[in-house]
Amino acid sequence: MAEKRKYSKKYCKYTEAKVEFIDYKDTTLLKYCLSERFKIMPRRLTGTSKKYQEMVEKAIKRARHVALIPYIVDRDNVVTNPFEGM
């Protein structure tokens, strides 16, 4: 039988920083919850609490709608650090 993956306990960056609102225009704050292909990372990997994960998801979706963050990235255009040029 396959072994279960064990994830280490991670702590919410937003709770520690006492963030009250996550703005969709602040892409540097949103980069912690995006993968190198600009996909939203799950809570178990980022350690974000449920409250802040919902706020982050809404902010990322709004930023995508306003074209601050791309929806998808092609396999040829994958970047290691998506916010390097900002």
From Swiss-Prot:
* Signal peptide residues on this chain, from the entry's feature table: none
What are the GO MF terms of this UniProt record? small ribosomal subunit rRNA binding; structural constituent of ribosome
Please give the start and end residues of each transmembrane region.
Answer: none
Kindly state a single biological-process term from the GO annotations of this entry: translation
Subunit comment for this entry?
Answer: Part of the 30S ribosomal subunit. Forms a tight heterodimer with protein bS6.
NCBIfam families xrefs: S18
**One Gene Ontology cellular component annotation held by this UniProt entry:** cytosolic small ribosomal subunit
Identify the taxonomic lineage of the organism of origin.
Bacteria, Pseudomonadati, Campylobacterota, Epsilonproteobacteria, Campylobacterales
Q: Which Pfam families match?
A: Ribosomal_S18
Q: Which family does it belong to?
A: Belongs to the bacterial ribosomal protein bS18 family.
Q: Which UniProt keywords apply?
A: Ribonucleoprotein, Ribosomal protein, RNA-binding, rRNA-binding
Please indicate which superkingdom the organism of origin belongs to. Answer: Bacteria
InterPro entries with a match to the protein in the record: Ribosomal_bS18 (IPR001648), Ribosomal_bS18_sf (IPR036870)
Primary role:
Binds as a heterodimer with protein bS6 to the central domain of the 16S rRNA, where it helps stabilize the platform of the 30S subunit.
Name of the protein: Small ribosomal subunit protein bS18
| Keyword Metal-binding applies | no
